[in-house]
């Protein structure tokens, strides 16, 4: 049984300029004290074609974590535009929030991100070379996908993402955790059984389409 459950995520400052920081307010419940840190990462998927374009925007460590409810704001600088392929600069991509314990990733939350020009004329006739300073970033806050991985909470480090995947329909699945690029595909394709598409009725309440908050019941 997981000892940490994300119960709410609020996307702050959304929509926003491309060069503004990403900001997420995360609420999580810890069912018992954790002696070691939780490792949180924010990852920007630079291209669906290759994982080599992924950028870890920031990594933070939270802990030791006492039992109870905790809230913090995870803020990270925007991606390095020199590492984004020009054909992938404008349009839909993904930002991932992941959490690991003792080197084992146990949950990731993926959001669609749409980067487009605020100027209607530029949307109709986009420049050949992307003008990032003219782009607006819009995170589809009401439609995240959550993937949960079964890990060993009580013992030493285990390589990879654990022994299986948990979701609202299956407690365990005999499969290794996906790579970042595979996880990006999981966010895009709703038929992937290892992810929870939200909003849905299975213990998850989503706010309206224009809301930047997602409430999840554990």
From Swiss-Prot:
PTMs per UniProt: Phosphorylated on undefined residues by tlk.
Subcellular locations according to the entry: Nucleus; Chromosome
Function: Histone chaperone that facilitates histone deposition and histone exchange and removal during nucleosome assembly and disassembly. Cooperates with chromatin assembly factor 1 (CAF-1) to promote replication-dependent chromatin assembly. Plays a role in the formation of silent heterochromatin.
Encoding gene per record: asf1
Native source species: Drosophila melanogaster (Fruit fly)
Superkingdom classification of source: Eukaryota
Transcription keyword on record: yes
Family matches, as Pfam families: ASF1_hist_chap
GO biological process, one term: chromatin organization
Name the record gives this protein: Histone chaperone asf1
Family of this protein: Belongs to the ASF1 family.
């Amino acid at each position: 049984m997981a000892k940490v459950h994300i119960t709410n995520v609020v996307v702050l400052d959304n929509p926003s300029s491309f060069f503004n920081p990403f900001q997420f307010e995360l609420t999580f419940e810890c069912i018992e004290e954790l002696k070691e840190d939780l490792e949180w990462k924010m990852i920007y998927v630079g291209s669906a074609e290759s994982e080599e374009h992924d950028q870890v925007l920031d990594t933070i460590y939270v802990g030791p974590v006492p039992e109870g409810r905790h809230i913090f704001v995870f803020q990270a600088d925007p991606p390095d535009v020199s590492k984004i392929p020009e054909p992938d600069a404008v349009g839909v991509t993904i930002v991932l929030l992941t959490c690991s314990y003792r080197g084992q990733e146990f949950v990731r939350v993926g959001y669609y991100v749409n980067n487009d020009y605020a100027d209607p004329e530029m949307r109709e006739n986009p420049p050949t070379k992307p003008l990032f300073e003219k782009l607006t970033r819009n995170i589809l806050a009401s439609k995240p996908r959550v993937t949960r991985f079964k890990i060993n909470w009580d013992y030493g480090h285990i390589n990879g993402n654990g022994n299986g995947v948990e979701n609202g329909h299956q407690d365990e699945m005999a499969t290794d955790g996906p790579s970042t690029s595979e996880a990006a595909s999981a966010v895009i394709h709703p038929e992937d059984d290892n992810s929870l598409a939200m909003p849905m009725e299975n213990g998850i309440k989503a706010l309206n389409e224009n809301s930047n908050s997602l409430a999840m019941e554990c």
